[in-house]
């Protein structure tokens, strides 16, 4: 019998939505991740967090607490999901691609501090100046400009299936 734990890091609430959806499917409760969270007694730990500057927030901490073969990671971001985005994120965060799931999150400017807003403004400016923008870049630029919720809870179903299928 597997014991599952779902933990999340969320600043604006979008990642929390995914964590609660996944936890509900696994019949457990999603918990806000805090460094030092007890994960030893669980056979599978699902870590949900957001991407900022190419890094999955607090991933290094959870990786120090959970064995790689027990850890599944769901990352939310402003870019639309794609195989290329997943590969890049896995490489940049030193994760096995088969344990990483990337989904669209959201952007609520009212919940961000000055520093995060300034950083996002720089990202937006860089994208605006990019001469060879592709469709994903254009969509990310639109999302960075307008903000909003881009959550699609069903996009986390492959993670749920993989967690349940892994025996």
Describe the predicted segments one by one:
Residues 1-67, 161-166:
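N-terminal beta1-alpha1-beta2 submodule of the flavodoxin-like/Rossmannoid cofactor-binding fold
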Residues 34-115:
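Helix-loop-strand module that forms the ligand-binding subsite of alpha/beta enzymes
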